[in-house]
Amino acid sequence: GAGGVGSNSNGNGGPGGPGQSSTISGSSVTRAGGGGVGVYQSGSGGSGGPGGGGNSQSTGGTNQGGGGGGSNMITPVRQGGSGVVVVRFPSDTPLSNSGGSPSTAPNGDKVIVFNGSGNFTVG
């Protein structure tokens, strides 16, 4: 979501908006995004909004995205919290993953294991 604005030209940026959360029908994958940023021309950036699921936190939790970072044009940008991708499958149906290759759940969903930082696109 979009951040709110300060009360004057040198005011602080408003808080970030809430993240988006959605459950994909018929799938074992649930995605929750982080909150939006607070943006203003001068002054401090706003704090992050609540992540998907309504939980205000710096990083993602189970089924919840983290809050977004504050941002403005003068002082350094604060990093936003992480969104999360949660993959669920029955505990009596073990999955294995070897060499970075995708595994496939019984319902056909692909389970991909990856490590790193920055921006990822999973499709």
Question: Where do the PLM segments sit?
Answer:
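Low-complexity, glycine/proline-biased repetitive segments and flexible coils/loops
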Residues: 1-123
